[in-house]
A protein has these predicted regions:
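Structured, active/binding-site neighborhoods that engage oxygen-rich ligands
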Residues: 1-311
C-alpha cells in the first residue's frame, strides 16, 4: 500500500516536472529536441525551472496533501483556503479557470483539466474510505474551481481509481474495467463515457488544438494505463504527444504510479525530486518558492497520507 501511494505522488510530481520541459510544444518540436524521448529531469524548459521543480499542477497538489495530513480529513473550505494561499503566492503559472474560480467567478462552461491535475493526494488519502466518499470529496474539490459536471465526474473517477489501486493491488486492465463500471453506475455524462470507451483502442486524436481539456488528459491516462508496458513509457509517451504536457503527464503519472508503485519510478526522477529546493538566492533558481511547494519530502508525505487517521 505504501509503495503504491508513494508511486502515485512521485508519478504526479515527476510527470509534471518532466512535462514542464516541453509544455505547449508540438510533437514535431519535441521529437527534434528529444529524439529518444524526454527522459531526464533537468533545469530549464518552458518555465526555466530547476530539475524536479513543480509547476502549478503539483504545487496545488502538495498543498492539498499537506492539508489532508494536517487536518486528518477533507473539507472543501479548508482546501479553498489552501488554493487561495497558492494563488496569492505569486505562482509563475496559473490557469484561467482556476484563477477565475478562486476569485469568486467560477466558469461553469469550462472543461479544463485544472481540478484533476491537483487531486491525486485525495485518492491516496481516500484509499481507506468507501469509494462513494472518495467520489464525493473529489467532486467537491473540483467544484471549487471547475463546477462543470464533466470536470466533477472525471475527478471522481480518477480519484476512485487511485484509491482502489492502492488498496486492491489490482492490475492495469482490472483497474480500467472498474473505472468503466463506476462510470456506468454513477452514471456520468455521455461524453465522458465515450472517451473512456475510446481509450481501449486509441489515445486522444488531437493533443494540441484543445490542449488543457480534461477529457484529453483522462483519455490519455486511461490509454496509457491499458497499453503502456511500464510506468516510465506511459509518462514519456504522454509527453511526446505535445500540448499541455505537464498536466497530461502529471495525471497519467499519478494513475500509473498508483498501479506500478515506487519501485517503477526511475532513480534519476526520484533523486531530482528529493533534491529540488527552489530557494531564493540560489544562482540557478529563477522562480524561488516557499518550502511548502518543494517536493523534497515526497516519500514521507505520501506515507503520511496513507497513515493519517481521520478526525
Amino acid at each position: 500500500m505504501i509503495s503504491r501511494a508513494q508511486g502515485c505522488l512521485l508519478g504526479q510530481l515527476a510527470g509534471d516536472a518532466l512535462g514542464g520541459l516541453v509544455e505547449f510544444q508540438s510533437p514535431e518540436e519535441i521529437r527534434r529536441s528529444y529524439p529518444k524521448g524526454v527522459r531526464d529531469l533537468a533545469d530549464g524548459g518552458t518555465w526555466n525551472t530547476i530539475a524536479g521543480q513543480p509547476t502549478d499542477d503539483s504545487e496545488m497538489a502538495l498543498l492539498l496533501a499537506r492539508m489532508l495530513v494536517k487536518n486528518g480529513s477533507y473539507d472543501p473550505e479548508a482546501a479553498r483556503k489552501e488554493y487561495q494561499y497558492w494563488l496569492n503566492s505569486d505562482p509563475f503559472d496559473c490557469g484561467m479557470t482556476i484563477s477565475a474560480g478562486l476569485q469568486g467567478n467560477p466558469d461553469s462552461n469550462s472543461q479544463a483539466n485544472g481540478a484533476m491535475m491537483r487531486v491525486s493526494p485525495l485518492g491516496i488519502f481516500g484509499a481507506r474510505f468507501a469509494l462513494n466518499q472518495v467520489a464525493e470529496w473529489a467532486m467537491q474539490d473540483a467544484a471549487l474551481t471547475h463546477p462543470n459536471l464533466i470536470c466533477q465526474q472525471a475527478n471522481a473517477l480518477f480519484t476512485m481509481g487511485i484509491a482502489h489501486s492502492i488498496t486492491s493491488v489490482c492490475e492495469a486492465n482490472e483497474l480500467y474495467k472498474s473505472i468503466r463500471q463506476w462510470a456506468v453506475d454513477l452514471p456520468v455524462e455521455t461524453k465522458l463515457l465515450d472517451i473512456i470507451d475510446r481509450a481501449v483502442n486509441e489515445p486522444p486524436a488531437d493533443y494540441i488544438h484543445q490542449q488543457g481539456w480534461v477529457l484529453i488528459a483522462f483519455q490519455n491516462a486511461l490509454y496509457q494505463l491499458i497499453h503502456s508496458t511500464n510506468f516510465e513509457e506511459g509518462v514519456v509517451n504522454t509527453i511526446m504527444h505535445g500540448g499541455d504536457t505537464d498536466t497530461n503527464a502529471a495525471i497519467c503519472g499519478a494513475l500509473l504510479g498508483a498501479v506500478y508503485g515506487r519501485e517503477a519510478i526511475p532513480a534519476q526522477w526520484l533523486n531530482s525530486l528529493q533534491n529540488c529546493r527552489p530557494e531564493a538566492g540560489h544562482p540557478h533558481v529563477q522562480h524561488p518558492r516557499p518550502k511548502c511547494f518543494w517536493p523534497v519530502d515526497v516519500l514521507e508525505l505520501a506515507e503520511e497520507l496513507c497513515l493519517t487517521v481521520s478526525i
